[in-house]
From Swiss-Prot:
The lineage of its organism: Bacteria, Bacillati, Cyanobacteriota, Cyanophyceae, Oscillatoriophycideae. It comes from Picosynechococcus sp. (strain ATCC 27264 / PCC 7002 / PR-6) (Agmenellum quadruplicatum). This is ATP synthase epsilon chain. NCBIfam families: ATP_synt_epsi. The keyword Ion transport applies. Belongs to the ATPase epsilon chain family. F-type ATPases have 2 components, CF(1) - the catalytic core - and CF(0) - the membrane proton channel. CF(1) has five subunits: alpha(3), beta(3), gamma(1), delta(1), epsilon(1). CF(0) has three main subunits: a, b and c. Signal peptide: none annotated. Produces ATP from ADP in the presence of a proton gradient across the membrane. Keywords: ATP synthesis, CF(1), Hydrogen ion transport, Ion transport, Membrane, Thylakoid, Transport.
Length: 134
């Protein structure tokens, strides 16, 4: 039995397809969803959603929520991009820049540290979805 997955941002639907499995980056760790999964509502962190049909596809996301109900997974996030649509070299450069920025943040500036960590997670997700950090 197929699992219907929709990944939706405020301005577009990134994925609307039937898949065999989806792995979500929840706030408590990765969650694998198969057909027949129990109903679930979970917070998502910036990371990579992996969906499996005949092969695996990666989608980089920022924070949001996922709802699982009746063999349907609805993912509502601020931003999302399919790995195949992300330039690997640009993603690598952005990730390296975010790492350097975090290293340079004033340790006393808690907001700056949080912002830099958030940017690092976002750029890491894009780099991983594009095929980096294998």
């Amino acid at each position: 039995m197929a699992l219907k997955v929709r990944v939706i941002t405020p301005d577009r639907t990134v994925l609307d397809d039937s898949v065999e499995e989806v792995i979500l980056p929840s706030s408590s760790g990765q969650i694998g969803i198969l057909s027949g999964h129990a109903p679930l509502l979970t917070a998502l962190e910036s990371g990579v959603i992996r969906v499996r049909t005949s092969g695996w596809e990666n989608i980089a996301i920022t924070d949001g929520f996922a709802e699982v109900e009746a063999n349907e997974v609805k993912v509502l996030v601020n931003t999302a991009a399919k790995g195949q649509d992300i330039d690997l070299e640009e993603a690598r450069k952005a990730f390296e820049s975010a790492k350097a920025q975090l290293d340079q943040v004033n340790a006393a500036d808690r907001k700056a540290i949080l912002d830099a960590r958030k940017e690092l997670k976002r750029t890491r997700a894009r780099y991983m979805a594009a095929g980096g950090m294998a």
